Amino acid sequence: NPNTNIDGMRTAKELGLATKDADATEIITRAQAVSIIHAALTNTKAAQEPPIVTEMKGVVKDLPQSAINDFYADMAKVPEPIRKAFIADGWKICFDTEKINEYSDKSGIYGIDGMTFYSEKTIYLATARSLLHEMGHYYQEKIKTTGIDRNVYSTFETIRSKEKWIGTLYSSNRQTNGAEFFADAFSYYVTNGIVRADPAGTDAKATLQSQEYFDELAAKGWLFTR
């Protein structure tokens, strides 16, 4: 069908799969057909970019190909007000194992998957799995500096001492202070809606202060003025 050929060629040109002067009436060879099909399969113009990818453009650097899906899936879990504040504040996320290894050598702390540098406004990641934990560090500092809770660090020191061993999540096993506890709790909460790792455990009937704290933040839109 000549009309079909013309319509098809026009679409191919729009997608960049054929040259602007290509003639739809010419018979193409099998090799040319294979070339066009391959271009169509690998063409990215036809695929709509996910909103979370568009939103984070210019924020994420050196994201490994193998981590793309996991990274954006977790970033989408971060409440939108926090993501927007992160971007507006000029923060960046860099996948930089060299930077992390240098820090490990200087500090003597090894096995680090992520770091949050407030002075640089940068989160450094070795793997995507640390994203939510590090975003928790950013958010806790934001809570303090915006005046939502200027005592959030001391508050979570107290909460950690009460809750660490009664079922609240502590995935890193490095909760030496309230900040690490907060970051772990944030990561678990935005993923599951709870901070308790085992809601059916022995503390199931206990009222966890950390749960109430995050429930209030979520109910008020995460970033607000007192």
What are these regions (language model features)?
Residues 1-51:
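N-terminal propeptides
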